[in-house]
Amino acid sequence: MADLKKLAEEIVGLTLLEAQELKTILKDEYGIEPAAGGAVMMAGPADGAGGAAEEQTEFDVVLKNAGASKINVIKEVRGITGLGLKEAKDLVEAGGKIKEGVDKAEAEEIKGKLEAAGAEVELA
């Protein structure tokens, strides 16, 4: 049981790039495909009193598809994240979070740059 807890702590502590590499390894070597949606859903309030929804202040910029101009998207990802060429290429090919926890203005700016380069992007 302690080994499972240690493994869970290591997985939670992965960087974005390490998580992308883990996804690729699980897919290529073990044939494990990521679940649709890829997120764990939390249960809502049991009493039905949701109250007023709070406005989201932090956003994650998620690359859904690099599109036909993958080279342009890689260049933009490098500029946005500061990653090296190989790391940016791996991130673009795997898809996923480009930036986490950014304010709405920055998230919209990044989304605009990536979409101008030909990528399909969503804010979460």
From Swiss-Prot:
Q: Which GO terms describe its molecular function?
A: mRNA binding; structural constituent of ribosome
Using the record, list the residue span of the signal peptide; answer none if the entry has no such feature.
none
Q: Which UniProt keywords apply?
A: Ribonucleoprotein, Ribosomal protein
The GO cellular component terms are: cytosolic large ribosomal subunit
Q: Which InterPro entries match?
A: Ribosomal_bL12, Ribosomal_bL12_C, Ribosomal_bL12_C/ClpS-like, Ribosomal_bL12_oligo, Ribosomal_bL12_oligo_N_sf
Zinc listed as a keyword: no
The biological processes this protein is annotated with in GO are: translation
Free-text function comment from the UniProt entry: Forms part of the ribosomal stalk which helps the ribosome interact with GTP-bound translation factors. Is thus essential for accurate translation.
Name the protein family: Belongs to the bacterial ribosomal protein bL12 family.
- Assembly and interactions? Homodimer. Part of the ribosomal stalk of the 50S ribosomal subunit. Forms a multimeric L10(L12)X complex, where L10 forms an elongated spine to which 2 to 4 L12 dimers bind in a sequential fashion. Binds GTP-bound translation factors.
Name the chain's protein. Large ribosomal subunit protein bL12
Species: Jannaschia sp. (strain CCS1)
Q: Which gene encodes it?
A: rplL
